[in-house]
């Protein structure tokens, strides 16, 4: 009872004198605006490292990254002409090297296999089952050419799809003495018509072209004007 009475008396004194018997706590410091306390900084660092369970960091919506290393080049034929792809779809040789229609992308699409794309038009060079060269808006199996370095350091481009049935001789890309494209089955690898010298303009990265089906009737290259 005495202890209870003394406790009641002590409580009454605390009510009458609130600051009398309580220890004075240190006054809380208020951080000025624009600054963060050490605890706040640590909390922000901790939250920045927290990953939600089952979640992944957001990635920007990007297209597929280029993975193929090729070159932008001019193809100079030993006959004295630069290979040129014209806007009307025709392919021919020209003695002038200033035209942007002589710029081609050489994109690797297999082991020693490339596709030859017009850097200006975006069309692919193709050879059909008759050995005729034409320009295709889509990448097909007829747009694949085997690349081979000849003994004189010129490069040969042979159709990766077609060749002579009996002898197995390759069909080559070639220009005649007038700069006109030749049928692949009439071009011999030992002749100047098939010898091309790539003149590097720049190295570039490319996306792998999407393969389309070969059309039932592959168009041939229209005659050059």
Swiss-Prot record:
PROSITE patterns: HBGF_FGF. One of its GO terms (biological process) is cell-cell signaling. Keywords: Growth factor. It comes from the Eukaryota. Residues 1-28 are annotated as: Disordered. One of its GO terms (cellular component) is nucleus. One of its GO terms (molecular function) is growth factor activity. Nervous system. CDD domains: beta-trefoil_FGF11-like. InterPro entries: Fibroblast_GF_fam, IL1/FGF. Belongs to the heparin-binding growth factors family. PANTHER family: FIBROBLAST GROWTH FACTOR (PTHR11486). Probably involved in nervous system development and function. This is Fibroblast growth factor 11. It comes from Homo sapiens (Human). The lineage of its organism: Eukaryota, Metazoa, Chordata, Craniata, Vertebrata. The gene is FGF11.
């Amino acid at each position: 009872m005495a202890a209870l009475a003394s406790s009641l008396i002590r409580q009454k004194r605390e009510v009458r004198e609130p600051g009398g018997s309580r220890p004075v706590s240190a006054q809380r410091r208020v951080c000025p605006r624009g600054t963060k306390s050490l605890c706040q900084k640590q909390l922000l660092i901790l939250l920045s490292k927290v990953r939600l369970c089952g979640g992944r960091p957001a990635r920007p919506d990007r297209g597929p990254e280029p993975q193929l290393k090729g070159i932008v080049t001019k193809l100079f034929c030993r006959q004295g002409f630069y290979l040129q792809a014209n806007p009307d779809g025709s392919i021919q040789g020209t003695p002038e090297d200033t035209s942007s229609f002589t710029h081609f992308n050489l994109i690797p699409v297999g082991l020693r296999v490339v596709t030859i794309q017009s850097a200006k038009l975006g069309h692919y060079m193709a050879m059909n089952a008759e050995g005729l060269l034409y320009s295709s808006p889509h990448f097909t199996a007829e747009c694949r050419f085997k690349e081979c370095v000849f003994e004189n350091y010129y490069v040969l481009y042979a159709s990766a799809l077609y060749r002579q049935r009996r002898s197995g001789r390759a069909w080559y890309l070639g220009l005649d003495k007038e700069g006109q494209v030749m049928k692949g089955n009439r071009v011999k690898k030992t002749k100047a018509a098939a010898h091309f010298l790539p003149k590097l303009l720049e190295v570039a990265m490319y996306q792998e072209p999407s393969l389309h089906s070969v059309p039932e009737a592959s168009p041939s290259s229209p005659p050059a004007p």
